């Protein structure tokens, strides 16, 4: 006896989350073009939430597919590659043109560098699925890089700290270039996943749950600034662990 066909509504569900994330990234670009930078940054974080949900929904409903994987990757390129680059450019990097025409080109080149590195990072991730240790990301994940970029914009775009994008243009340039290079680096970043296989493969370690509790408390106190602190600490964690491992390495005997 043949099993009943799976409902198309269930099959479409994970792709609807992906579409919602894609819409959020597209909206971020539109909002930035209209000078609504806080809304643009928030939209990218909404896209990150949708990106975290679509894969889990697909696994829970047993509706994972190659189409969904490819669609998710393309949506990520818009939401975590193009959108953060354009938001940062409109908010701050475009102001470099007031220094000189050369610096103006440096500004949009940095934005392009970020978008290109995000594309390379996503392509590398797709080719390494099932090959690398799930406990680690090789290079800063594109959602984390986008979070670093957008938390920086969000923290200062509301003018509560007394700085605007034009004043912070060189800091923004550094943040953009560093985030781009970290994505294509070989530095390992903790993925917050365990190393188990089988049904327990996606379970989150207890330490990650403890960290999440602290993070939630910080987010309640000051959302924008807390996201920036978290983004900076996570971006630094990979290089610091790399330096620690090199320092601890015992030199070989001649």
Where are these regions (language model features)?
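Active-site His/Glu-centered metal-binding helix of metallohydrolases
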Residues: 23, 49, 53, 57, ...
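Hydrophobic, well-structured mid-protein blocks that either form specific transmembrane helices
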Residues: 109-148
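C-terminal membrane-associated helical module and adjoining short loops/tails
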Residues: 1-2, 134-254
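Topogenic membrane-insertion module of multi-pass membrane proteins
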Residues: 1-52, 241, 245-247, 251-254
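Multi-pass membrane catalytic core of lipid/isoprenoid biosynthesis enzymes
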Residues: 13-18, 60-122
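Helix-coil boundary and interhelical linker segments in multi-pass alpha-helical membrane proteins
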Residues: 27-42, 84-109, 152-171, 220-224
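Alpha-helical transmembrane segments of polytopic integral membrane proteins
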Residues: 26-29, 46, 50, 84, ...
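Short juxtamembrane and helix-loop transition motifs at transmembrane-helix boundaries
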Residues: 1-9, 33-39, 64, 68, ...
């Amino acid at each position: 006896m043949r099993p009943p066909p799976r409902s198309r509504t269930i099959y479409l569900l994970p792709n609807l989350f992906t579409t919602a994330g894609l819409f959020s990234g597209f909206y971020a670009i539109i909002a930035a073009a209209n000078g609504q930078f806080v809304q643009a940054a928030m939209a990218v974080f909404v896209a990150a939430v949708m990106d975290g949900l679509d894969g889990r929904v697909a696994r829970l409903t047993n509706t994972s597919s190659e189409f969904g994987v490819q669609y998710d990757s393309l949506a990520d390129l818009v939401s975590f590659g193009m959108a953060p680059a354009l938001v940062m450019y409109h908010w701050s990097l475009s102001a470099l043109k007031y220094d000189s025409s050369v610096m103006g080109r440096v500004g949009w080149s940095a934005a392009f560098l970020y978008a290109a590195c995000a594309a390379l990072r996503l392509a590398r991730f797709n080719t390494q699925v099932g090959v690398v240790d799930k406990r680690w990301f090789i290079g800063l994940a594109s959602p984390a890089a986008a979070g670093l970029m957008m938390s920086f914009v969000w923290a200062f775009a509301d003018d509560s700290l007394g700085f605007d994008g034009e004043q912070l243009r060189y800091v923004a340039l550094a943040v953009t270039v560093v985030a781009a290079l970290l994505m294509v680096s070989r530095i390992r970043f903790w993925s917050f996943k365990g190393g188990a296989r089988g049904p327990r493969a996606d379970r989150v370690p207890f330490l990650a749950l403890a960290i999440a509790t602290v993070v939630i408390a910080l987010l309640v106190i000051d959302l924008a600034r807390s996201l920036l602190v978290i983004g900076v600490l996570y971006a630094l964690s990979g290089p610091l662990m790399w330096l620690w491992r090199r320092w601890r390495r015992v030199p070989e005997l001649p």
